[in-house]
Amino acid sequence: MANLKSIKKRIVSVKNTRQITKAMKMVSAAKLRRAQENVVAARPYAGKLAEVLERLAKTQESDASPLMVKRDTRRALLVVVTSDRGLCGGFNANLSKAAERFINERKGDFSELSLMTIGRKGYEFLRNRHTVRKHHGNIFSTLSYHTAALIAAELVEGYLAEEYDEVYVIYNAFKSVMTQDITLEQLLPVTAKTADTDEVGTEYIYEPSKAALLDELLPKHIEVQVFKSLLESVASEHGARMTAMDSASKNATEMIGKLTLIYNRARQAAITTELMEIISGSESIKG
């Protein structure tokens, strides 16, 4: 009977856990819809701004703005974007390990490679392994463009002060509920891509002037790229957590089925034993 009670207690415990994982899945699904809408809205704006900036930058000298000047690379900063919370599968661990791979592969290229971590999980993983220059935590629950602009301003200020010569960001880009792609991008210095063949010969008129627009667009471009990275990470986090909680719920259901089968067999064996004892007692009385 003691064994039956322990099995029944475990079944109740797993059922309670399944209720929690199902609830977390539903919450993540609701948050994912909103986060996905934000990502879908931000991508065209970020893409078009980058396109305009690239066209403009191609017509200027590489030193037209301090943010475009490519210096002798001595120091680099890697911005690592993870989440503040867990229970989202390998979302944080995979990205933190990818950041560490980048550090190990590129550390020979720099005299110093430091980190800025956004999200508690990445900070906890990397703080004892590498130099964390700055940490931003607890920003995702109230994430806004203003927050991203403040972080971008820190990056630009440090770059202009020559605290670092290159800035990279690594984050999970949202592809689908099941898929998040670890993405590494260079934020600073801003570089213009090679002109597309279908744009050759096209002339654009810029007002008030190319230099003035460049000075205005470059900081805005950094802000938008940081904001997009954060939005992508938030959507990816909710997708990963939704998938993880769905898997946990299915595993719990499977475990409940197995435990129920074990319980029924144990109960049947206990009843059979009791019947045999009753029959044996009855036979001994008759004898």
Curated annotation (Swiss-Prot):
It is a peripheral membrane protein. GO terms for molecular function: ATP binding; proton-transporting ATP synthase activity, rotational mechanism. This is ATP synthase gamma chain. It is found in: Cell inner membrane. The keyword Ion transport applies. Pfam families: ATP-synt (PF00231). NCBIfam families: ATPsyn_F1gamma. Produces ATP from ADP in the presence of a proton gradient across the membrane. The gamma chain is believed to be important in regulating ATPase activity and the flow of protons through the CF(0) complex. GO terms for cellular component: plasma membrane; proton-transporting ATP synthase complex. InterPro entries: ATP_synth_F1_ATPase_gsu, ATP_synth_F1_gsu. Its main location: membrane. One of its GO terms (biological process) is proton motive force-driven plasma membrane ATP synthesis. Keywords: ATP synthesis, Cell inner membrane, Cell membrane, CF(1), Hydrogen ion transport, Ion transport, Membrane, Transport. F-type ATPases have 2 components, CF(1) - the catalytic core - and CF(0) - the membrane proton channel. CF(1) has five subunits: alpha(3), beta(3), gamma(1), delta(1), epsilon(1). CF(0) has three main subunits: a, b and c. The keyword Ion transport applies. Belongs to the ATPase gamma chain family.
